[in-house]
Amino acid sequence: MTTPPGYLLDTNILSDLIRHPQGTVASKIEAAGEQSVCTSIIVAAELRYGAHKSGSRKLADRIDLILSALEILPLEAPADRHYGEIRHHLAREGNPIGPNDMLIAAHALSAGLTVVMTANIGKFSRVPGLSVENWLAE
């Protein structure tokens, strides 16, 4: 029986892994266990957009390689409920985050995962109940 994933890797963490395949993120994945990490279809879409925007075939190939090695979770219910709650809460607080970040947070909450990122800790930490880690801050 395989261990269910515990960590959802965000776009900036996977971007760092693409830039530094033997770097800190790779070491953290190895320490956590490859079966304990996954990503969201939202993150995969953001990475693919970045590859198309750059026009770099080399970058697209690296993204293909990274994504082929990861479990990519489809966005399913009850993520929609979490999204509605998150968006309402952040709007009421007057402190919204981007739509893709809200979807990623909702996806992680619905799957019971910790979101791993770098620069976005501040905005993701405003989402009630969401566990976040910065694997590059240590």
Indicate where each model-derived feature is located.
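Nucleotide phosphate-binding site architecture
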Residues: 14-15, 45-48, 73, 125, ...
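Residue-level signal for well-ordered alpha-helical positions
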Residues: 20-21, 50-54, 86, 93, ...
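Generic structural signal for small/hydrophobic residues in well-ordered secondary structure
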Residues: 10-11, 25, 47, 83, ...
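Residue-level recognition of specific faces of alpha-helices
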Residues: 28, 69, 82, 123-126
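Active-site neighborhoods of divalent-metal-dependent phosphate/nucleic-acid chemistry enzymes
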Residues: 1-5, 61, 71-116
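Alpha-helix/helix-capping structural signal
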Residues: 12-13, 42-45, 78, 122
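Short, well-structured N-terminal submotif of metal-dependent ribonuclease cores
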Residues: 1-39, 49-67, 138
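Acidic, metal-binding active-site segment of PIN/NYN-like and related structure-specific nucleases
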Residues: 6, 105-138
